[in-house]
């Protein structure tokens, strides 16, 4: 399904991050991360070619907005994945953003990522 696409996972809950990483690998994608903070995510973005991303909204150090802005500016398909609804500020800034609440099955997220990459 993913054919070696590099997917950045930004998620601070270890079990959820593991589920996402496993799903990416099973779909024949390459996992970048997971990153549990904005700082970690920035380092990974500097070190790797990110072709798609699944972003938790609230991380251990702050919200994911700086990472989302960086990736979206570069045309990287992004899915927000949060325990809560997407914050108003992010929804207003990115009205067409794909946002899912936990516990959406990882395969559903990956199907949406593939659809976004084909646009």
List where the protein language model places each region.
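Alpha4 helix (beta4-alpha4-beta5 surface) of REC/receiver domains from two-component response regulators
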Residues: 66, 73, 84-102, 107-111
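Acidic, metal-coordinating helix/loop segments flanking the phosphotransfer/catalytic sites
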Residues: 34-52
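Active-site residues of response regulator receiver
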Residues: 56
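Non-catalytic signal-transmission and effector/linker regions of two-component phosphorelay proteins
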Residues: 1-6, 39, 91, 101-119
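The feature encodes the CheY-like receiver
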Residues: 60
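Conserved acidic carboxylate
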Residues: 11
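Two-component/phosphorelay signaling modules centered on CheY-like receiver
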Residues: 14-33
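Hydrophobic/aromatic residues positioned on beta-strands within the core alpha/beta folds
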Residues: 79-81
């Amino acid at each position: 399904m993913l054919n070696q696409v590099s997917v950045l996972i930004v998620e601070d809950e270890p079990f959820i991050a593991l589920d996402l990483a496993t799903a990416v690998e099973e779909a024949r994608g390459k996992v970048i991360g997971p990153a549990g903070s904005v700082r970690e995510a920035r380092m990974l973005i500097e070190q790797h070619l990110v072709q798609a991303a699944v972003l938790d909204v609230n991380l251990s150090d702050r919200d994911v907005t700086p990472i989302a802005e960086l990736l979206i500016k570069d045309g990287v398909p992004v899915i927000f994945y949060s325990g809560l609804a997407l914050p108003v500020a992010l929804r207003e800034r990115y009205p067409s953003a794909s946002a899912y609440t936990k516990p959406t099955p990882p395969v559903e997220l990956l199907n949406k990522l593939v659809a976004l990459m084909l646009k």
